[in-house]
Swiss-Prot record:
Probable gustatory receptor which mediates acceptance or avoidance behavior, depending on its substrates. The keyword Metal-binding does not apply. Residues 1-12, 109-141, 201-266, 317-371 are cytoplasmic. Residues 34-87, 163-179, 288-295, 393-397 are extracellular. The chain crosses the membrane at residues 13-33, 88-108, 142-162, 180-200, 267-287, 296-316, 372-392. The keyword Cytoplasm does not apply. This is Putative gustatory receptor 93c. Coiled coil: none annotated. It comes from the Eukaryota. The lineage of its organism: Eukaryota, Metazoa, Ecdysozoa, Arthropoda, Hexapoda.
Length: 397
């Protein structure tokens, strides 16, 4: 059994997790396209599904209408002003997130498809760059991040479905289903952002691996210990590989910047809505625990919400740190030729790396890094302390 586990390819498992997650997003009506294999060369292609897209949009519009009609009166009847305010924030965030998905699917459909096609084309180009045959997605880091994300998705779906067993009538069941459809569907934008940044990190990682192993070996093969001339044919081959590596690196930065610009605002809006929902859920579990028969399950949802933010931040950090790895390889220091064009090429490439460095700055306000995790955790601990003090002062704890 252990020997079989050792033979399992982690990149292949990562690709399987992505395959399952893609179909999960299609069920929730967020992913309205299909990714399949071309019969001629087995490459992945994107196929648009217009009828399925309009069906998903209709379901989301019905869900938004149902939440406004059935959930808003319930929120208006809440007596506690603090809880009513939080529930209003949660309901507003859910509706805004649903509308945000509709806008993305209607107004930015072509841009999304072009971006996904660019990602698939880049992966094919990077695989052709290396002589090593790669199957799957990413490496060990990408696998473990995807595994934790998949566990979060499964727990999220399980927790939401468990809410349906204790509803009194069919109207409550319908309203709850619509609310669940909106909430889980809106969270898929965060998951798509996570996968997108992780894809950028995987692309950078593969190109860095090619430069560190194969390209460096080819550059060393051109060194002449006695200062002899380098063969033109051999130099031309290495120059072609270097040009292709530089071109791929520039293309990854361009596609990553396009992805960030396209999903920057939706991810930020839905992330803020998720934070509101987490604060409300933690408040109710602490102050009104009698409403929940499964308190441990509810605290699991709170932890899962923390994990979503942390995993998204780690994916961004992985992409940013991988984009800076090329400068640390010091490939420009190989004394292979005295041609000025060769050294000028590397100087221009390194200058572009500094100028077009891949960075993630939501709305230009701050740069996403691991410090965001500490800031988020410290703010949530402060909020928990405030809620506990409020419960003690009002004799609810």
């Amino acid at each position: 059994m252990i020997e079989r586990l050792k033979k399992v390819s982690l990149p292949a498992l990562s690709a399987f997790i992505l395959f399952c997650s893609c179909h999960y997003g299609r069920i929730l009506g967020v992913i309205c396209f299909d990714i399949g294999q071309r019969t001629s060369d087995d490459s992945l292609v994107v196929r648009n599904r217009h009828q399925f897209k309009w069906f998903c949009l209709s379901c989301r519009l019905i869900s938004v209408t149902a939440v406004c009609c059935f959930c808003a009166p319930y929120v208006a009847d809440i007596e506690d002003p603090y809880e009513r305010l939080l529930q209003c924030f949660r309901l507003s965030a859910s509706l805004i997130c649903g509308i945000c998905i509709i806008v993305v699917q209607v107004c930015y459909e072509k841009e999304l498809l072009r971006m996904i096609i660019s990602f698939l084309r880049l992966f094919r180009r990077v695989r052709r760059l290396s002589s090593l045959k790669r199957i799957g997605f990413g490496g060990k880091r990408e696998f473990f991040l995807l595994l934790f994300k998949f566990i979060c998705l499964v727990y999220e779906l399980y927790s939401e479905i468990c809410q349906l067993w204790h509803l009194p009538d069919s109207l409550s069941l319908f309203a709850t289903l619509c609310e669940i459809f909106l909430e889980i569907g809106s969270l898929m934008i965060i998951h798509i952002g996570f996968v997108g940044y992780l894809s950028v990190a995987a692309l950078y990682s593969e190109v860095n691996s090619f430069a560190r192993i194969e390209l460096r070996r080819q550059l060393r093969s051109l060194e002449r210990p006695v200062g002899g001339p380098v063969g033109r044919k051999q130099l031309r081959i290495v120059e072609y590989r270097v040009d292709e590596c530089i071109s791929v690196y520039d293309e990854i930065e361009r596609v990553g910047r396009t992805f960030h610009r396209l999903l920057e605002l939706p991810v930020l809006i839905i992330l803020l809505g998720k934070i509101f929902a987490t604060t409300i859920l933690s408040y109710e579990v602490i102050i009104r625990p009698e409403l929940y028969a499964r308190k441990i399950g509810m605290w699991g949802l709170v932890v899962k919400s923390f994990a979503d933010v942390i995993l998204l931040t780690l994916a961004v950090h992985e992409a940013v740190s991988s984009s800076r790895m090329m400068r640390r390889l010091s490939l420009e220091n190989f004394p292979i030729t005295d041609h000025k064009a060769w050294h000028m090429k590397w100087e221009m490439f390194l200058s572009r790396l500094n100028f077009f460095e891949f960075r993630v700055r939501p709305l230009g306000l701050f740069e996403v890094s691991n410090e965001v995790i500490l800031l988020f955790l410290s703010s949530m601990i402060t909020y928990f302390t405030y809620v506990v003090q409020y419960g003690i002062q009002t004799n609810r704890l």
